[in-house]
Amino acid sequence: MPRSCSALAYAAEQHAGQLRKVDGAPFIVHPIEVGSLLYDAGAGDDVIAAGLLHDTIEKTGADAAELRRRFGARTAALVAAVTEDEHINGYERRKAALCRQAEAAGPDAMMVFAADKVSKVRELPVERARSEAETVSRTRQRRLNHYRRCLEMLERHIGDSPLVRQLRAELEARSAVSVRRPALADAV
C-alpha cells in the first residue's frame, strides 16, 4: 500500500472529531486538500504523505517519533519541517520561524509548506471591497501578510512550482493590493 494511503487513514483517525474554525467542516478536509494539491503538482509519495500528516503533531496527540516509526524518517522530517514551534511566543515570531524552518529543510518541505498555504488562503473569503484596510479584520490582515511573506520566500526557491503560482493567484484574488513580485535580482 502506498505510504500516502496509510497516511490518509492515520490522519483521518488522528483528526477524528476535529472541526475547522472557518466553516465547521471536518478538519480532515484541510489535510486532504493539501495532499491533493501535492499529488496534482507531481510530488512523490513521501511528500504527499507528509502533506496529509502535516498538522498531526500540532493538532493531535501524534509525535515525530510515532510518525518516523509508521511512515519513515523522510516523511517524518518533512512533517517536522512544517510544524510550528509552540515555544515561540507571538504570532509574527512563530510564523517567521516556521517560514525559515521550511526554507532550510529544502524543496520538498517547501512544497508541503506551499500546499498548506494554498489551502489556508482558500479558507479566506475573497475580498470585494476597494480598500482591504477599511473592511478587513486585523486577524485576516495579519494572516494575509504572513502568506505574502511565505510567497516571497517560496518564489525565491521553488518559483516554478505550480503550487507557488496557485498561492500567488489565491492571494491576489483575496487582496485589494496586488502581491509584489520579486525582482529578478531578488531571486538570485
Per-segment meaning from a language model:
Residues M1-V188:
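Active-site helical microenvironments for divalent-metal-assisted chemistry
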